């Protein structure tokens, strides 16, 4: 077996892992959102989290085996990010899972096979760990796999025993480590030595149930949960010193370094830490915003805000003074879009959120940094080593300066912050807030279960009624419970009964009105929290009071559109199973009033012919006027009849079945047409990939078709008018314009180079002779970095033995400097990379490159003459 595994890119590692297990009957599933279903955690923190209900016996899995590459975010070790080799906030966890199917022996065998035969690790480079009491796993590694006993380490419960909580499913685990230095031998192996070992694959064997007394009882159905860190595998296979220098992260770091005008490899450790923090955190924020998390002061929104602010501050620490996060985000989007196309689809939202947060925080920094500097000076003058909690709270309360940022700046100045004092001030502030309101025990964001004793849960009537008389049980303003609300107010209303469908199963909530004696509320959305339907809307007239009797009326036109799109989604899945592959299953969906979106598991793109056939099949079923049959059945009976369930979805003992006989039968709680003919027509707009092994179809149906056609006609007409051609001539005209643009860009680049060369040729007569060498040091006006480099190379070629240093300001506050040295100059001990990096610091930048040719950047254009003057002086001193 090779001890020199082949280089693989991050994307290749991900695909190799998923395909390995797909070939072994595992269903490839898309990464779940970073917003988890589990209410006990803010963010998806592990590859197994989406399957936790299955492991806990709360859901019945559709598949016995699954494999995923799961996006994860953890911030518990945020202070270590950039300071260690492998700590991250964002990471990808590759995993294979068994739900009551294969167990320990097979999981270990496949873990070893993919490590040695697929990724090419030599057995001599691998060490495994087992739980100290797991003799079974120890024997499998020793007897069946053949791992030497000296390279099987028994570890305690803290390291090698997985638990889901104080009670419940649990079990031992076994980890595979890569050994960078097997030549050091097998004696005194210390797996905590991260200079030698890195754990890259964890196999969890869920085989016990732990009761309240701590007793372990074997589970009837044993499960497998594994995790392979993608970034760690990339570090090993790409032979780089840490996770940050892999192709998954380093291009982001390089982008940040380029903006700062510095070179990563020649930077000091403090600068490298800041660059790593930026590289890591930008990955997190891009994926968080792509998963529709918005920055705020609570929950996961606060995590996002904190990460963005850390990016901005570390940008300042490396010399970036203006806004830059959207540029770095573009690099992260480009790296991620092949595996997660939603980041490109959400590009505008990502950049808008970043720009808004960065702009606001820069103002916060400007206001707060000056005061913090004064506080630090005062603390030092007093001989103290701690910033008071009161001072830290003033920064937070008055200037919006986060406590974490105050703590970071304090640490850089060898000070601490009185966090307890800060919290005490915060409690005083909260007390003032509580005094201003009566008891607040109802929030839209949180669970409403605690109100079950005080108000009636909502009875849903929407399957059979479009209007209903109801009682107002609760009114909320910005999540705060109120007894009444006035006209013009945005409110959330809980009714005792409602015809409004609440957002669920991919279908958005109904729209409509709540009205009563002098009251009109426009309902703009409906969401379900526990057993309560929360109606979001605006009071257009009157005063709304708890206990009022009102009429709740949905907008029938919106409901018809949603029903048409939802039933069309069911028909679409049935058509995909019939025409493309019977094994296709739903991976996600969106049913709105104007369109539908259906994500499904499929390892390849559909052909144009398949897309057309699917569309034709759906329209055929619509034309055949199939009547709907709706039943509520026991879950087992529904599945026995062949009803399609969504993998990982939680179902009760009884389920609602939507059946269009001989066409489609699914478990579904949404609203549907009573006959397929009501849909009218169905049109596929697009088919594309959204993740590895997951495709997405977007379509329109019913009344929304007319909106789509009108919009398309308007776009075509606008383009035809703009280009002054007939609609059918547009493709040729656009192709022609694209060709002209490419040619113009090439001509422009050529002209730039020619202009730079022309400017540089005039410098030949300014060459000075120093010893046996000629030197040229000069500033060229408005020359871009690439053309400046070409000019320097040409000048050096003409003078032969010598050195050329050129500088330019291609745009405001951006300096470019190039150094080109002949071999004779190199022999004098001058290296272009080090030389140009040193003089660029005068302009507030840095850079580097090869001994004979190097380039650097800076931010202070006013200092360029000083930098070039220093370059000339240094060259003359060294070459004389």
Curated annotation (Swiss-Prot):
Cofactors, names only: Zn(2+)
One annotated Gene Ontology cellular component of this protein: cytosol
Cofactor note: Binds 1 zinc ion per subunit.
Known EC number: 6.1.1.7
Pfam families associated with the record: DHHA1, tRNA-synt_2c, tRNA_SAD
Reactions that this protein is recorded to catalyse: tRNA(Ala) + L-alanine + ATP = L-alanyl-tRNA(Ala) + AMP + diphosphate
Origin superkingdom: Bacteria
Keyword terms, alphabetized: Aminoacyl-tRNA synthetase, ATP-binding, Cytoplasm, Ligase, Metal-binding, Nucleotide-binding, Protein biosynthesis, RNA-binding, tRNA-binding, Zinc
Gene Ontology molecular function, alphabetical: alanine-tRNA ligase activity; aminoacyl-tRNA deacylase activity; ATP binding; tRNA binding; zinc ion binding
Location(s) in or outside the cell: Cytoplasm
Biological process (GO), any one: alanyl-tRNA aminoacylation
Transmembrane segments: none
Main location (coarse class): cytoplasm
Binding sites annotated in the UniProt record for Zn(2+): 566, 570, 668, 672
Known function: Catalyzes the attachment of alanine to tRNA(Ala) in a two-step reaction: alanine is first activated by ATP to form Ala-AMP and then transferred to the acceptor end of tRNA(Ala). Also edits incorrectly charged Ser-tRNA(Ala) and Gly-tRNA(Ala) via its editing domain.
Family per record: Belongs to the class-II aminoacyl-tRNA synthetase family.
Comment on protein domains: Consists of three domains; the N-terminal catalytic domain, the editing domain and the C-terminal C-Ala domain. The editing domain removes incorrectly charged amino acids, while the C-Ala domain, along with tRNA(Ala), serves as a bridge to cooperatively bring together the editing and aminoacylation centers thus stimulating deacylation of misacylated tRNAs.
Protein name: Alanine--tRNA ligase
Protein species of origin: Nostoc punctiforme (strain ATCC 29133 / PCC 73102)
